[in-house]
C-alpha cells in the first residue's frame, strides 16, 4: 500500500476526478449500447459506433489511465509528478473534448464543433505527454517499465494527431489512402501503441507487486518491447501503403511480442507468494483470458477465408469490441479495486495511522457487489459478442442490458470508495 501511495504522490484532488468521470462515462456507454444495439450490426464506420467508441477509449479508458498514471508514475519512476497544473488542465480539456467529439460523431458532423473538440483532445494529450516526459526525464531509474510508458505516450500523441488528420481528410480530402484504411491505422496505433504498451509498462510493475512475486525474468519484457514496436511500425506503414502482406507480417511479429509479455505475467503468477487472489485480481485475470478472442479474430480477418466473407463486417466489430469492451475495460475495472481504495484510504486516514484501529483499503467497497459486477460483466460481454458476431439485435440488447447492470454496480462501489468518510473518530 505504501508503494502505491508514495511520498511523491500528487494530491488526491488531481487523481480522483479522473476515476469519477471515467466511471460515469462507462455507465453512459452501456446505456447507449442498450438503446442503440443496431450500431454494432453495421459496418464499423457508422456515426453511433464511432461516438460510442470514442466515449469508451477517451472518456472511460484513457481518462482512468491518466488518473491512475499520475498516481503510479511516482511509484515506477521514484520522483514527483512534474506538474499537477498540467494534470488538472488536461483533465478538463479531455473531458470537454470527449463529450463534444462524441456529439459530433453522433451527428456525423465534421464542422466547427468537431474541430474544437479535436483541438481540446490534442492539447489535453499534449499536456499529459509533456507531464510524463518531464517526469521521466527527472528520474534516474532506467527500467523497461519506464520505457514502455514513455513510448506509449508518444504513440498516444501520434494516435490523436492521426485522428485529427482523419477528420480534416474527411472534409478536405488530400490523402490517397481510403478513409477505412486510415481508420484502421488510427485504431491500431491507439490499441497497440497506446493501450497495450501502457498496460504492459504499468502491469509489469504492479501485478508482481500485488501478487508478491520475486525474481521474474524482465528480459521477456524487452523482447515484447522490440517485437511490438517493430511490428506496429511495419503494420502502420503497410496499412498506409495498402500492402496486405506487410500487415500480416506485422501481426506475426506483434503477437509473439504480446505472448512474451503474457509469459512474464504467468511467471509472476506461478512465483507469487500471495496465493489467494482478491476480486480486483480475479477480474484482472479474467481480462487476460479474454485476449484469446481478439488473437483468434485478427488472424481470421487477415487471412480473409472465402467462406467467412459475409461475416467480415461483424467479425471486425467483434474484434474491436473484444479488445476495448472485453480486455481493456475488464482490466480497468479490476485495477480500480487495486488502486483507488489505497488512494482514498491514505487521503482519509493519513494523520491517524498507528493511532487507532483503522479499516483496511478493501473495506472501502463491497466485495459482494464487486463479485456480482464481475459475473454480470462476464455474462453481458459474452452475449454482446455473440450478438455482434451473429448480427442479432435482441441478443445485443440483452448483453447491453446486463453490461449496464454491471456498470451500475461498478459505479456504486466507485463512488462508495470516493465518498468514504473516516471511521473510529
Please report, for each region that a protein language model flagged, where it lies by residue.
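Hydrophobic alpha-helical transmembrane segments of multi-pass integral membrane proteins
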Residues: 1-425
Amino acid at each position: 500500500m505504501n508503494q502505491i501511495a508514495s511520498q511523491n504522490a500528487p494530491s488526491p484532488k488531481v487523481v480522483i476526478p479522473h476515476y469519477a468521470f471515467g466511471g460515469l462515462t462507462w455507465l453512459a456507454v452501456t446505456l447507449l449500447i442498450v438503446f442503440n444495439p443496431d450500431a454494432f450490426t453495421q459496418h464499423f464506420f457508422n456515426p453511433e459506433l464511432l461516438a460510442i467508441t470514442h466515449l469508451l477509449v477517451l472518456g472511460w479508458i484513457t481518462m482512468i489511465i491518466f488518473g491512475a498514471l499520475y498516481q503510479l508514475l511516482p511509484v515506477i519512476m521514484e520522483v514527483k509528478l512534474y506538474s499537477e497544473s498540467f494534470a488538472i488542465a488536461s483533465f478538463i480539456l479531455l473531458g470537454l473534448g470527449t463529450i463534444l467529439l462524441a456529439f459530433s460523431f453522433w451527428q456525423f458532423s465534421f464542422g466547427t464543433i468537431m474541430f474544437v473538440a479535436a483541438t481540446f483532445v490534442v492539447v489535453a494529450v499534449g499536456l499529459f505527454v509533456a507531464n510524463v516526459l518531464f517526469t521521466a526525464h527527472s528520474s534516474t531509474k532506467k527500467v523497461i517499465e519506464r520505457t514502455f510508458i514513455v513510448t506509449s505516450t508518444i504513440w498516444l500523441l501520434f494516435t490523436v494527431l492521426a485522428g485529427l488528420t482523419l477528420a480534416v481528410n474527411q472534409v478536405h480530402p488530400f490523402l490517397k489512402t481510403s478513409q477505412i484504411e486510415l481508420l484502421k491505422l488510427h485504431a491500431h496505433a491507439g490499441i497497440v501503441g497506446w493501450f497495450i504498451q501502457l498496460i504492459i509498462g504499468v502491469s509489469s510493475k504492479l501485478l508482481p507487486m500485488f501478487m508478491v512475486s520475486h525474481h521474474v525474468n524482465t528480459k521477456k519484457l524487452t523482447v515484447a518491447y522490440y517485437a511490438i514496436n517493430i511490428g506496429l511500425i511495419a503494420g502502420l506503414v503497410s496499412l498506409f501503403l495498402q500492402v496486405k502482406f506487410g500487415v500480416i507480417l506485422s501481426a506475426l511479429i506483434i503477437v509473439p511480442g504480446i505472448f512474451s509479455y503474457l509469459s512474464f505475467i504467468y511467471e509472476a503468477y506461478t512465483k507469487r507468494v500471495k496465493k489467494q487472489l482478491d476480486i480486483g485480481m480475479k477480474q484482472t485475470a479474467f481480462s487476460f483470458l479474454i485476449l484469446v478472442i481478439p488473437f483468434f479474430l485478427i488472424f481470421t480477418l487477415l487471412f480473409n477465408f472465402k467462406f467467412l466473407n459475409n461475416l467480415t463486417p461483424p467479425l471486425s466489430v467483434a474484434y474491436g469490441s473484444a479488445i476495448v469492451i472485453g480486455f481493456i475495460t475488464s482490466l480497468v475495472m479490476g485495477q480500480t479495486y487495486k488502486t483507488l481504495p489505497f488512494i482514498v484510504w491514505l487521503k482519509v486516514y493519513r494523520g491517524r495511522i498507528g493511532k487507532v484501529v483503522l479499516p483496511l483499503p478493501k473495506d472501502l467497497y463491497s466485495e459482494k457487489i464487486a463479485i456480482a459486477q464481475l459475473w454480470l460483466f462476464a455474462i453481458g460481454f459474452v452475449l454482446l459478442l455473440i450478438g455482434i458476431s451473429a448480427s442479432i439485435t435482441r441478443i445485443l440488447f440483452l448483453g447491453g442490458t446486463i453490461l449496464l447492470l454491471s456498470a451500475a454496480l461498478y459505479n456504486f462501489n466507485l463512488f462508495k470508495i470516493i465518498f468514504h468518510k473516516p471511521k473510529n473518530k
